[in-house]
Curated annotation (Swiss-Prot):
Catalyzes the attachment of serine to tRNA(Ser). Is also able to aminoacylate tRNA(Sec) with serine, to form the misacylated tRNA L-seryl-tRNA(Sec), which will be further converted into selenocysteinyl-tRNA(Sec). This is Serine--tRNA ligase. Keywords: Aminoacyl-tRNA synthetase, ATP-binding, Cytoplasm, Ligase, Nucleotide-binding, Protein biosynthesis. Its EC number is 6.1.1.11. GO terms for cellular component: cytoplasm. Consists of two distinct domains, a catalytic core and a N-terminal extension that is involved in tRNA binding. The gene is serS. GO terms for molecular function: ATP binding; catalytic activity, acting on a protein; serine-tRNA ligase activity; transferase activity. L-serine binds at residues 238-240, 292, 391. The keyword Ligase applies.
Amino acid sequence: MLDIRYMRKNSAEVKQRLEYRGVNPETIDELLELDQKRRDLIQKVESLKAQRNDVSDKIAFAKRQKEDASEAILQMKQVGADIKSLDNEQTLLDEQVREIAAHLPNMAAFDVPVGPDESANVEQRKWAPEEYGSRPHALEEASWVKAHYEIGENLGILDFERGAKVSGARFLYYVGDGARLERAVYNFMLDEHRQEGYTEMITPIVVNDSAMFGTGQYPKFQDDAYRVEGLNQTYIPTAEVPLTNYYSGEELPSEDLPIKFTALSPSFRKEAGSAGKDTRGLIRLHQFNKVEMVKFTKPEDSYEELEKMTLDAENILQKLNLPYHVIVLSTGDMGFSAAKTYDIEVWMPQQNVYREISSVSNTEDFQARRMHITYRDADNKLQLVHTLNGSGLAVGRTVAAILENYQNEDGSVTIPEVLRPYLAGQEKLEPTTHH
């Protein structure tokens, strides 16, 4: 949620910055007009309440003097009726203001590239392991290079057919070494983040609608969520929701900041509007595992912490020796709550393209305002914290990248060295028979 006081004082700037995010400036005019009406009403109500107090005093005085107070009593009733009418009007205005404000995205940080969509994203850096060039398919696409889902099916470790039979499209079973590889990947990720000072959590996977509102998924993205029928609850689209809401409504001790959490969770997404995209494989599923990172920071530290969190995600890819690049998203491609976002995209040799594997964002105080998460600054004034979140990483997409980047011509897949301790020293995935 944006700061309405800032919007009042800086309406021209806010209109310009939100126009970069796709918001019609007239929407801001409408919001500020309703806000002004609401404030005028509040003043009227306060004035009437003062008048009511005066009349009440007059009635009490008249009664003490045994004088006729009927006129004052009538006046009192009229003032009471006027207050009630204005209160109802104010409630309606409050709802209208809230409804518009709840649909406004965050303003982008000033250094974010301005543009309508992903075409305006800017590459920050790219990385590939030195030995990557010696992999046979790294420099030119070898004829035997297969897509991760073909490799997984040939090895008997990914079963999309039975996933579809039991649950529908975009679901799968990990089988045998596939399940072990997925587990190895997320345990490795969690261990790395723990070493970087993140507290590991296991969170609920069903949250209240208020939690979805707090992180900015609701009200705008309800169509993409799996709702629990008959309850105001939702299956989480990311562990960002329960992790960030952990402190909703709380004041955090200043000396504890930054606070860093990490969690593995299943994520559930309807993928509304993705018909025809990535219909095969692990890239776009309705249910997938993801390791999430979340931070609560002081405002002056949040951008330094954003850079650190991005490096924490990159660290995983570097230790897995997977090539990637980092891009900063433009104003037209950023998520609803973000003020600045880095996407990390991993190299997928069969598609000959980089694919998103992590998104790391600073939401500044946008989420904290919705959730009322505060701390006291050096002057002992209550301030909103800044919240950050990032994937560290999407587990299925990491498995997909490993299968494609570590595949061998004989159909086997070499297991990255850092994962071998999690797989009892196993060095390769080879075809197995299962029914």
